[in-house]
Amino acid sequence: MDDLCARFLLNIPDSERLDMIRLMFQIELAHWFYIDFYRVEDKNLPEMRLPQFAARIFHAYPFLIHGDETSVSVLISNWKEYKKEVPTFGAIIMDKKMTHCILVQGNSERASWGFPKGKVNIDESPEKCAAREVLEEVGYDVSPLMDKKNFIEVDLAGQINRLYLCPGCPLKTEFVTQTRNEISNIKWFPIDALPLFAPPFVSAIAT
């Protein structure tokens, strides 16, 4: 735990360490690192969900908590509410004829299919976020295919979701996720036979 805190929490700028929302994002990164590397190398380490992991960190380093609120559960709840409003950006990767597009499937047992996308980082532009998330999830640099003005954007319960339309990807492209324990499947789907998981996006690209 000390090594994780030194890597992700203790040496970050004060602007992030003193802001509980930003600090929680760093704790989330530390939690992913714990799952992806520490527990893979040492099976005896306990499995911990984020709330339990955060509680252990705050117990070991109570000086990390700033402000009037000291309840870990409330801090996590506030952070989760904030995350719901963070915009997400990604891409609809299509072949040259625009008859097929790429979908990804999460790693959980009941994961559905979706377009590669993710939450924007602080001070990150929408198009850079989209390119970064796509590269992480499918291992493909979509930047050369991206037109900053060509996108579909929907507001889902107060959260902006934008997908850039990126035609021109060869169907023979080999996609390999750069993530760990996040993406289980990457597959081309015919646009006229997409799963009905996101009607606003599906209807927009099918017309």
Predicted regions span which residues?
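Extended, charge-rich, solvent-exposed interface segments
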Residues: Q178
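Long, compositionally biased charged/polar stretches
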Residues: L196-P199
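N-terminal leader/linker segments that precede catalytic domains of diphosphate-processing enzymes
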Residues: M1-S112, K119-R132, Y140-E174, I183, ...
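Short, intrinsically disordered, charge-balanced linker/junction segments flanking boundaries
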Residues: F201-T207
